[in-house]
Amino acid sequence: MMMSLTKTPLPRLSRLMLLVSALASTSLVHADPNLADEAPAAPTASPPAETPSNFHVTGFLSVIGGQVFNGSLPGNYIGPSQINGVTCPCYIADWANGGVYRDNFSLKPESHAGVQVQYNFSPTLNFVGQVVVRGEDTTPNVSWAYFNYKLDDHWEVHAGRQRIPLYYYSPFQDVGFAYPWVSPPPELYGWDATNYNGASLRYTNSFGDNNVTASVFGGEEKVAESGYYKILYAGHTDVSWSDIIGADLELNHGPLTVRAVYLQSNTTTTNPGLSLDLASKLKAYGVAVNLDFDSWFVLSELTQLTRDYGPTVYSYKAPAATIGAGLRLEKWTPFINYATYSESADNPTLFPTTPSKFKRTSLTLRYDIDSNSDIKTQVDHHLDTTSNTSGNVNVVRVSYDRIF
């Protein structure tokens, strides 16, 4: 997140991994099979057999409300007075879509709903599509539209519109029921592109008690009127990521899951109103390490993104990290989390603003209503350590998540 502001579970992780698999190649939750029409039959006739449908519709919903309380701007604050129309002190909860909370309760910044469809042409070929609407943008957005072809028991190809797998929770980032927070840590999960149009090759296998998943992917993405840059700049900003190339590898052994990812892309950012036309080379590295011991679990993730604008301009690094631990007490899951984000530039005199640093501590309490829905309450304490982002704030949020 380069900032002219003066700026990633289900009740058990095993269920979470099942959801990952479902999102990768099927729908979230299969709809009930359609029953064959019953023809009149003699009393001794066998009951008609069920005929599974090739078409499935599923969905997810997160109604999230929150507000800032006890917010303040330090005396040496040099950041903006407003972010995306919201007066600061404020809290940026969703960088990718421009979701910002203020001192009045609002459902707009993060609430969203999605519908996913899947059509199976054959046992080896299907199509998956997903449309999402948000409080910040009520226009339906196609986030997935890809064909999945299974080459054999271990290899499959996806071609079309997909999620950039930059983070551990990227494939199901919009499915609030899939994780313990109200929303994934914005210190990591929030950049100017989250999807891409292209192709990926995916491999899965098991070796004894070890499970392996790997993929390579490539493509491009264009975002008109970027929600991310509404936070940073006035007016309309368009974004293009071209020549996206990346790979990820995930290993699971018992309670331990480790994932590594690499991505690179050429990017351009244009805003005619500000005479802005920037080109950069982006590189990203990430590692996630998770532990799940049934009654308690630990989630951690570290990423570093770099943007190089050329030798006559500047380049900067933006490492971000999160670590959290939770305890499962039947239907209740308390979860504590810490996250941090920082920037550093190789030529500070040319960097548009003072590099930003901020950190956040949060406490979440989740209650599982049933196997398809939950409610969560989360309190965040956000510190703007360089006094140039949004101020120091406390935030309270509540959410209702459902899959159907």
Map each language-model feature to its residues.
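N-terminal periplasmic/intermembrane-space "pro-region" immediately following the signal or transit peptide
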Residues: 2-7, 13-83, 90, 399, ...
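Outer-membrane beta-barrel pore domains
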Residues: 4, 34-36, 101, 148-150, ...
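Surface-exposed strand-loop-strand hairpins of Gram-negative outer-membrane beta-barrel proteins
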Residues: 50-53, 66-111, 229-239
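Residues that define the transmembrane beta-barrel architecture of outer-membrane proteins
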Residues: 53, 103, 107-113, 139-143, ...
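Outer membrane beta-barrel
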Residues: 56, 62-66, 102-223, 250-254, ...
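Signature for the C-terminal beta-barrel architecture of outer-membrane proteins
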Residues: 85-89, 153-156, 191-330
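Flexible, solvent-exposed coil segments and beta strand-coil junctions
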Residues: 92-96, 122-127, 134, 175-183, ...
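Extracellular/periplasm-exposed beta-strand and loop segments of Gram-negative cell-envelope proteins
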Residues: 100-106, 172-175, 185-191, 229, ...
